[in-house]
């Protein structure tokens, strides 16, 4: 039982360290950036935040595409 708990903890630490290394190297997008890309605001009532443009057809703020 103790061996299973220890190996589970070590496995979780390994996964966390790989994720942290990937985030630091830019291989995994930051969750905040992902949430901003998914942000949909109604244009007429609110102005779009920086990096977003108003899609007049859908009446929603969409991420600006370069």
UniProtKB/Swiss-Prot annotation:
Disulfide-linked positions: 43-54, 48-61
Span of the signal peptide: 1-22
Protein's cellular compartments: Secreted
Main localization of the protein described in the UniProt heading: secreted
Source organism superkingdom: Eukaryota
Alphabetized GO MF terms: toxin activity
Tissue distribution: Expressed by the venom gland.
Family, per entry: Belongs to the scoloptoxin-04 family.
Name the record gives this protein: U-scoloptoxin(04)-Er2a
Species of provenance: Ethmostigmus rubripes (Giant centipede)
